[in-house]
Amino acid sequence: MYKNWRDLIRPKQLQFEKESLSDTYGKFFAEPFERGFATTLGNSLRRILLSSLQGSAITSVRIKGVLHEFSAIQGVTEDVTDIILNLKGVRLKLHSVVQATIRVVHTGEGVVKAGDFVVGHNVEIMNPEHHIATCGKDAHFEMDMTVKMGKGYVSADKNRDEKAPVGTIPIDSIFSPIKKVNFTISNARVGQMTDYDKLTLEIWTDGSVKPDDALAYSAKIMKEQLSIFINFDEEAEPQAPEESQDEIDKINENLYRTVEELELSVRSANCLKNAGIKLIGELVSKTEAEMLKTQNFGRKSLNEIKDILSDMGLTFGMKLDSFPEPDMLRRLRGEQNEEE
């Protein structure tokens, strides 16, 4: 029965675009997948990212001198309805707590922004420039807000607390820290076969969670939800046969071969020479994005090299912590001397 999943192609590793990775955006790649698996996983991860990750949001507000949301505040341009709408756009992060109270007090002319909120060490404002209200000369604006942890969207009715002080107005809350998720499917090559899938995921967040962490959390959620469907003891499963030492040595030796042995086109070979890349190990440690930044190195050269590396069981973006190994270099040099 183990062949049901052991014979399937599995992605080698998760890669990401280093140049664009930030606290609010990440672009991730995984390949190869059996045909159809990338679509299944991409769609599932997207739904979980958008709906199931925990975040923080303002759930209620109390403004001094205001009893309901249809009131106006003396000296303030926006009415209470507009202020509540602005509060829904405030992005926050709670540290070590699930609920907190924040407040703001402003007297006189000026603009109130999210960065003006008085918060404790357990609350962090992710968009401090977000507009809240515009005050005139005779304004005295005083407001207390409750911040809670949650997921997805929660309506004002569900945020209503019967024990809250008079004048407390519950508001709709959008807890999700994920702004947007896109995924695309393209072809991936395994040896001479090109009918496999490559999954590309783009994740935008509000900064309260990093894109790579958000992806990891969503994968963990999916794994936990699927675990009940496994009706056998996974620990009793015999280990899959490991690669033979000969196969490992062959891959290792390929890393120490020169790029000249790849028999590349003149243009590609010159690009690698100008970039100072001599060994295949140096080449595969580069990401595709890094290679495309090499002078005169284009997509055509990239695809040419990818095809050749794939036939050798190698790919761009490999993590070679122990490369180069002095013993391996001496060994290969010795073999070359014997041949001469």
From Swiss-Prot:
EC number: 2.7.7.6
GO biological process: DNA-templated transcription
Annotated catalysed reactions: RNA(n) + a ribonucleoside 5'-triphosphate = RNA(n+1) + diphosphate
Keyword annotations of the record: DNA-directed RNA polymerase, Nucleotidyltransferase, Transcription, Transferase
Region (Alpha N-terminal domain (alpha-NTD)): 1-233
Enzyme class: transferase
InterPro entries for the chain: DNA-dir_RNA_pol_insert, DNA-dir_RNA_pol_RpoA/D/Rpb3, DNA-dir_RpoA, RBP11-like, RNAP_asu_C, RNApol_insert_sf
Recorded GO MF terms: DNA binding; DNA-directed RNA polymerase activity; protein dimerization activity
UniProt-annotated stretches for the region Alpha C-terminal domain (alpha-CTD): 246-340
One Gene Ontology term, aspect cellular component: DNA-directed RNA polymerase complex
Domain notes: The N-terminal domain is essential for RNAP assembly and basal transcription, whereas the C-terminal domain is involved in interaction with transcriptional regulators and with upstream promoter elements.
Family statement: Belongs to the RNA polymerase alpha chain family.
UniProt subunit comment: Homodimer. The RNAP catalytic core consists of 2 alpha, 1 beta, 1 beta' and 1 omega subunit. When a sigma factor is associated with the core the holoenzyme is formed, which can initiate transcription.
Function: DNA-dependent RNA polymerase catalyzes the transcription of DNA into RNA using the four ribonucleoside triphosphates as substrates.
Name assigned to this protein: DNA-directed RNA polymerase subunit alpha
Gene label: rpoA
